[in-house]
């Protein structure tokens, strides 16, 4: 058996990754990104992505988007270090024609108009801060924190805070 589609590589909401509840899906994605070094010590940028998903069995379509803006401060606190901030919205379904199907009765397999469409009501915002500290030419340590607002595109879900530490070895 074939697994469910994962259009967003496991980032963003479950509906964005699988907008048609496991049905065969095609996906076309457009994106743009920019990064501008304002000075030796300040870099700004961002990206925007927009995707068009189509249910391969029906004429149903879904639209998925994501975006972010970032600020980087190279050499902050020392050569090779980096202080960074990011704010954006993880992939989410903006609009979706799909409705769950009837599973019994004379309408089996048809869309049920009484059930909600698979779309994300609230934007899943993410705020991120990190500091890459260069120990030497080959090793850096990057502590950071992520704050997730409206996880899974639902404002009823509690805000999540996640601390991370990454060590990078470059040889």
Regions from the PLM with identified roles:
Residues 73-135:
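C-terminal hydrophobic structural anchor segments
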Residues 26-30, 60-67, 123-127, 157-163:
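Residues that define the transmembrane beta-barrel architecture of outer-membrane proteins
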Residues 132-165, 170:
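Predominantly the C-terminal beta-signal and adjacent terminal strand-loop region
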Residues 15-20, 54-58, 101-103, 107-108, ...:
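Extracellular loop and loop/strand-boundary signature of outer-membrane beta-barrel proteins
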Residues 1-2, 48-54, 75, 87-93, ...:
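Transmembrane beta-strands of outer-membrane beta-barrel pores
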Residues 32-36, 69-73, 129-133, 165-169:
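Residues on the lipid-exposed face of transmembrane beta-strands in outer-membrane beta-barrel proteins
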Residues 1-5, 41-44, 76-83, 135-143:
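Repeated loop/turn-to-beta-strand initiation elements of outer-membrane beta-barrel proteins
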Residues 1-37, 41, 52-54:
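Membrane-embedded translocation segments of transport machinery
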């Amino acid at each position: 058996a074939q697994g469910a589609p994962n259009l967003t590589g496991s980032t963003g909401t479950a509906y964005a990754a699988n907008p048609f509840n496991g049905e065969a899906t095609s996906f076309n994605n457009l994106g743009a990104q920019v990064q501008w070094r304002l000075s030796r010590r300040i870099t700004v940028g961002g990206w925007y992505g927009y995707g068009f998903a189509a249910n391969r069995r029906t004429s149903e379509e879904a639209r998925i988007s994501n975006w972010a803006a970032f600020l980087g401060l190279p050499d902050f606190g020392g050569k090779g270090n980096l202080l960074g901030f990011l704010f954006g919205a993880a992939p989410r379904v903006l609009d979706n024609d799909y409705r769950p199907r009837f599973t019994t009765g004379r309408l089996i397999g048809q869309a049920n108009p009484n059930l909600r469409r698979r779309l994300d009501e609230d934007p899943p915002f993410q705020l991120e801060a990190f500091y890459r500290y260069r120990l030497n030419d080959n090793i850096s340590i990057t502590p950071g924190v992520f704050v997730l607002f409206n996880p899974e595109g639902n404002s009823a879900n509690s805000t999540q805070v996640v601390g991370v530490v990454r060590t990078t070895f470059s040889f």
